[in-house]
Amino acid sequence: MNEVAIPSVLLDVPVPAATVHKQNLLDLDREGLEHFFADTLGEARYRAHQMMKWIHHRYVTDFDQMTDLGKALRAKLHQHAEVLVPNVVFDKPSTDGTHKWLLAMGTDGKNAIETVYIPDKGRGTLCVSSQVGCGLNCTFCSTATQGFNRNLTTAEIIGQVWVAARHLGNVPHQQRRLTNVVMMGMGEPLMNFDNVVRAMSVMRDDLGYGLASKRVTLSTSGLVPMIDRLATESDVSLAVSLHAANDALRESLVPLNKKYPIAELMESCARYLRGNKKRDSVTFEYTLMKGINDQPEHARQLARLMRQFDNAVQSKDAGKVNLIPFNPFPGTRYERSGETEIRAFQKILLDAQVLTMVRRTRGDDIDAACGQLKGQVMDRTRRQAEFRRTLEGQADRDAAA
């Protein structure tokens, strides 16, 4: 057998060490963490519970500060794991107490999302994003104008809650300033199903943020098959972006309606309620736009649809309506309905025994109101450039320090 001579120059080339993939623990719910500690680290599952408390109750991400974990375990964690939370590019308070954060997603300087905290009497609600951008092209939503970039990871979704809760000084089960989470930020949550459901599991876990299922709300534009899947995998509250009670008008506002028309959507919502006795209602969101969907006939159509829904579920107030005055953004052709039209619309619904609320506009002075989330600058290219400049400025400040 002939031997092959190896050039001496190759013998001097160092062989790179194998890169050990580190698991971001923020990507895991309780079950995932238990498996990671048992299977990867060879540790007892209760260690996962300690880790969840450090991350989500005490907001600690440095393993060396986790004092009830032994030195050997901390060494294994340093080798195999990390806790990466979103980087806060900037945060903006509103005059009404609303707070908006622009958060960096990833390390490439290309993706940033917004999350908003809305305080109210006796409650504090966090509006969480599920995607960078959105691909559903609803014509009245600012997020749609930037297009779809990618889904957020579980860590990036629950990381929004982590950032807000830490900023607020939230202490689960004690000093609770964050009482509700709504998946109503950027993106369509049901198009990022697995990551969203996993993140909502952490929100509701006593070792996470301890929120009751009814205090976590997922809002969808109407992906019928995924509503059915959600009914089997979660028991959170459901909200539907309806905005019109007839197919022709809804198709012009929510293009997804061409694939899943109103009749199919309403039946899937009825199945969602019938599948779990803990779920007693669906909230239907209706953005009021001047001269588009705010006329008395539109209100009467919506009232009929809600009565039909109650009958299908065989429960009074199974369908609740949340009227949302349109929040303008640069470049939109729509206008907000006047106060007179809004009250007249609500009165028709109330007279028809439909439980109806008007959402008070919050955070519009910082572009944090419903439908306004998209980033600080108008288009994706400019948004990314602004984001990179912000990070470079921070790096320069760190270097000078």
Swiss-Prot record:
One of its GO terms (molecular function) is tRNA (adenine(37)-C2)-methyltransferase activity. Keywords: 4Fe-4S, Cytoplasm, Disulfide bond, Iron, Iron-sulfur, Metal-binding, Methyltransferase, rRNA processing, S-adenosyl-L-methionine, Transferase, tRNA processing. Binds 1 [4Fe-4S] cluster. The cluster is coordinated with 3 cysteines and an exchangeable S-adenosyl-L-methionine. Its EC number is 2.1.1.192. The active site is at E114, C370. Residues 120-365 form the Radical SAM core domain. The keyword S-adenosyl-L-methionine applies. Its main location: cytoplasm. It is found in: Cytoplasm. Gene3D superfamilies: 1.10.150.530, Aldolase class I. One of its GO terms (cellular component) is cytoplasm. It catalyses: adenosine(2503) in 23S rRNA + 2 reduced [2Fe-2S]-[ferredoxin] + 2 S-adenosyl-L-methionine = 2-methyladenosine(2503) in 23S rRNA + 5'-deoxyadenosine + L-methionine + 2 oxidized [2Fe-2S]-[ferredoxin] + S-adenosyl-L-homocysteine; adenosine(37) in tRNA + 2 reduced [2Fe-2S]-[ferredoxin] + 2 S-adenosyl-L-methionine = 2-methyladenosine(37) in tRNA + 5'-deoxyadenosine + L-methionine + 2 oxidized [2Fe-2S]-[ferredoxin] + S-adenosyl-L-homocysteine. It is an enzyme of class 2 (transferase). [4Fe-4S] cluster binds at C134, C138, C141. The keyword Endoplasmic reticulum does not apply. Its cofactor is [4Fe-4S] cluster. Disulfide bonds join C127-C370. One of its GO terms (biological process) is tRNA methylation. It holds the Pfam family Radical_SAM. S-adenosyl-L-methionine binds at G187, E188, S219, S241, L242, H243, N327. Specifically methylates position 2 of adenine 2503 in 23S rRNA and position 2 of adenine 37 in tRNAs. m2A2503 modification seems to play a crucial role in the proofreading step occurring at the peptidyl transferase center and thus would serve to optimize ribosomal fidelity. Belongs to the radical SAM superfamily. RlmN family. PANTHER family: 23S RRNA METHYLTRANSFERASE, RADICAL SAM CORE DOMAIN-CONTAINING PROTEIN. Reaction proceeds by a ping-pong mechanism involving intermediate methylation of a conserved cysteine residue. This is Dual-specificity RNA methyltransferase RlmN. It comes from Xanthomonas campestris pv. campestris (strain B100).
